UniProtKB/Swiss-Prot annotation:
Protein name from the UniProt record: E3 ubiquitin-protein ligase TRIM62
Positions of the B30.2/SPRY domain: 277-475
Pfam families xrefs: PRY (PF13765), SPRY (PF00622), zf-B_box (PF00643), zf-C3HC4_4 (PF15227)
Location(s) in or outside the cell: Cytoplasm
Record keywords: Coiled coil, Cytoplasm, Immunity, Innate immunity, Metal-binding, Transferase, Ubl conjugation, Ubl conjugation pathway, Zinc, Zinc-finger
Gene Ontology molecular functions: identical protein binding; transcription coactivator activity; ubiquitin protein ligase activity; ubiquitin-protein transferase activity; zinc ion binding
Phenotypic effect of disruption: Increased susceptibility to fungal infection.
Coiled-coil region(s): 121-241
PROSITE patterns: B302_SPRY (PS50188), ZF_BBOX (PS50119), ZF_RING_1 (PS00518), ZF_RING_2 (PS50089)
Comment, domains: The RING finger is required for ubiquitin ligase activity.
Listed Gene3D superfamilies: 2.60.120.920, Classic Zinc Finger (3.30.160.60), Zinc/RING finger domain, C3HC4 (zinc finger) (3.30.40.10)
Start and end residues, zinc fingers (B box-type): 88-128
Length: 475
């Protein structure tokens, strides 16, 4: 056992593990330093003996014990507590039938005699029972971590499967929506084409009928004119003066109805009606059937911060650097945020509008709950009733989520499109110049929504002085 082994490795003089062990002729072992100091103290007596058996030596020789030194070295390579705590109940070594230890560092069973101690020097070595408890605890922790990971992966897979099904369903629905939108345009174009061709045929028939009637009338008149000319030619061919003059009296009667003035009048065929900016003409006729048409929104002056200046038609807002306007405060008016709401509140339907943001370095646009707070400093985020995107730091764009979501905008925006499908809970922002997508809010809107505008503060150095302007499409 470990305790018995330790006793065998103790010097009987210093009661510590042998240091540089040597043997005497009586085969007792001591530390070289210990036995040397013992004999120094005996020099006055003139005799030197063994502290164990008291055998005296005239000229003692100290023989190094290499085997014992190796055993001490192997023993010292293992932590003392691990050796003392090793139990006889541990699985025996087949070669030595000795207690086994366990190296926690290498995760391996150890035999004191079989395994090289130097290989496990500075390792964490313990007894079988302690190792069992320690590894049981570690493995239970790992099992719990794996079970947690299994649950998280299962939930993630369930979510991905739902998203997969929803994406397939959404794609199918969107294919239908896109198909219906284009089919409606195709149908409208076909209807306009049919109507225009029918109108062309009607104009053609009317013009041709008029021309044909005039051709018939002028043909009849031409024959009479030719008959009159022939009568006159025959009379002029008469050389006998008496005969010529005798027929003059009846000549006027014969020429009656033979002479007609042309006075030809006609209308040009209306080709300009079917040429010119034909596509623009067709687009204008289709515009009334396009849905949604960019809404002609206006801003509500009663909600505007006193630093904001609105145009007479309430479609343009700018930050004023002069003193605040002497406006009457009310619960509707923003008192800290330089903002203004739209006049119209949305509670259903599909709507679209555009805002011109060119040459600005700061702005916020989007939607706000009609009941959202307008007093004090406001956090522009969905939990506060605001669904907006923002331009900040001169050239950065973000969605006002929690936290903000940076938008991938390649070129500076000049015009932003805002699309609201209230019933579907969709608010989508576009680059209105090419209708490229910017960001989508998906929400269950709890009440009426108003368009939201903030031009940001302008600066004395001329930055951000341009206004925000609602883009009104005029046809």
């Amino acid at each position: 056992m470990a305790c018995s082994l330790k006793d065998e490795l103790l010097c009987s003089i210093c009661l510590s593990i042998y240091q540089d062990p040597v043997s005497l002729g009586c085969e007792h072992y001591f530390c070289r330093r210990c036995i040397t100091e013992h004999w120094v103290r005996q020099e006055a007596q003139g005799a030197r003996d063994c502290p164990e058996c008291r055998r005296t030596f005239a000229e003692p020789a100290l023989a190094p014990s290499l085997k014992l030194a190796n055993i001490v070295e192997r023993y010292s390579a293992f932590p003392l507590d691990a050796i003392l705590n090793a139990r006889r109940a541990a699985r025996p070594c087949q070669a030595h039938d000795k207690v086994k230890l366990f190296c926690l560092t290498d995760r391996a069973l150890l035999c004191f005699f079989c395994d090289e101690p130097a290989l496990h020097e500075q390792h964490q070595v313990t007894g079988i029972d302690d190792a069992f408890e320690e590894l049981q605890r570690e493995l239970k922790e790992q099992l719990q971590a794996l079970q947690d990971s299994e649950r998280e992966h299962t939930e993630a897979l369930q979510l991905l499967k739902r998203q997969l099904a929803e994406t397939k369903s959404s794609t199918k629905s969107l294919r239908t929506t896109i198909g219906e939108a284009f089919e409606r345009l195709h149908r409208l174009l076909r209807e306009r084409q049919k109507a225009m061709l029918e109108e062309l045929e009607a104009d053609t028939a009317r013009t041709l009928t008029d021309i044909e009637q005039k051709v018939q009338r002028y043909s009849q008149q031409l024959r009479k004119v030719q008959e009159g000319a022939q009568i006159l030619q025959e009379r002029l061919a008469e050389t006998d003066r008496h005969t010529f003059l005798a027929g003059v009296a009846s000549l006027s009667e014969r020429l009656k109805g033979k002479i007609h003035e042309t006075n030809l009048t006609y209308e040009d065929f209306p080709t300009s009606k079917y040429t010119g900016p034909l596509q623009y003409t067709i687009w204008k006729s289709l515009f009334q059937d396009i849905h949604p048409v960019p809404a002609a929104l206006t801003m509500d002056p009663g909600t505007a911060h006193q630093r904001l200046i609105l145009s007479d038609d309430c479609t343009i807002v700018a930050y004023g650097n002069l003193h605040p306007q002497p406006l009457q405060d009310s619960p509707k008016r923003f008192d800290v945020e330089v903002s203004v709401l739209g006049s119209e509140a949305f509670s259903s339907g599909v709507h679209y509008w555009e805002v011109v943001v060119a040459e600005k370095t700061q702005w916020v646009i989007g939607l706000a709950h009609e009941a959202a707070s307008r007093k004090g400093s406001i956090q522009i985020q969905p939990s506060r009733g605001f669904y907006c995107i923002v331009m900040h730091d001169g050239n950065q764009y973000s969605a006002c989520t929690e936290p903000w979501t940076r938008l991938n905008v390649r070129d500076k925006l000049d015009k932003v499109g805002v699309f609201l499908d209230y019933d579907q809970g969709l608010l989508i922002f576009y680059n209105a110049d090419d209708m490229s997508w910017l960001y989508t809010f998906r929400e269950k809107f709890p009440g009426k929504l108003c368009s939201y505008f903030s031009p940001g503060q302008s600066h004395a150095n001329g930055k951000n002085v341009q206004p925000l302007r609602i883009n009104t499409v005029r046809i």
